[in-house]
Amino acid sequence: MTAIQHFFKTFFLTELLKGLALTGRYTFRRKFTVQFPEEKTPISPRFRGLHALRRYENGEERCIACKLCEAVCPAMAITIESETRADNTRRTTRYDIDLTKCIFCGFCEESCPVDSIVETQILEYHGEKRGDLYFTKEMLLAVGDRYEKDIAAAKAADAPYR
């Protein structure tokens, strides 16, 4: 680019006019704003939301305390403590997820051999304090119990792709 061309581009502000023309084209188009609490957008079937722990049909929790989810978690958001029962099976005594650390990658769900930990379609949860986003085993089991039908349906729909 020669010095004269550069002078005319900067003197007549051609870049600025191109930007204003682009802005003007989008000014009168239809807006894509969604009024969130009243209007909902469609959620992907593979959306990863709030975590839940599942139980078997007989009421026993699925988690066998293999700690694969704790090992695979890149954010180190999962803490598990376990003990051996009288029948030589391991079960968790503590299963905590810190949602302030969690990046919702889904590795915990993928690594679980018994489909104990799942990520639900729930996206509307909050906490007033930092401690409200620290989910214990009992809280995760309560979420799983409450939404078991939805979780099972989502797992069945996603089964052909896994």
UniProtKB/Swiss-Prot annotation:
InterPro entries: 4Fe4S_Fe-S-bd, 4Fe4S_Fe_S_CS, NADH_quinone_OxRdtase_chainI. Its cofactor is [4Fe-4S] cluster. Residues 54-83, 93-122 form the 4Fe-4S ferredoxin-type domain. One of its GO terms (biological process) is aerobic respiration. Keywords: 4Fe-4S, Cell inner membrane, Cell membrane, Iron, Iron-sulfur, Membrane, Metal-binding, NAD, Quinone, Repeat, Translocase, Ubiquinone. It is a peripheral membrane protein. It is an enzyme of class 7 (translocase). Coiled coil: none annotated. GO terms for cellular component: plasma membrane. GO terms for molecular function: 4 iron, 4 sulfur cluster binding; iron ion binding; NADH:ubiquinone reductase (non-electrogenic) activity; quinone binding. [4Fe-4S] cluster 1 binds at residues 63, 66, 69, 112. Its EC number is 7.1.1.-. [4Fe-4S] cluster 2 binds at residues 73, 102, 105, 108. Belongs to the complex I 23 kDa subunit family. NDH-1 shuttles electrons from NADH, via FMN and iron-sulfur (Fe-S) centers, to quinones in the respiratory chain. The immediate electron acceptor for the enzyme in this species is believed to be ubiquinone. Couples the redox reaction to proton translocation (for every two electrons transferred, four hydrogen ions are translocated across the cytoplasmic membrane), and thus conserves the redox energy in a proton gradient. This is NADH-quinone oxidoreductase subunit I. It comes from Burkholderia vietnamiensis (strain G4 / LMG 22486) (Burkholderia cepacia (strain R1808)).
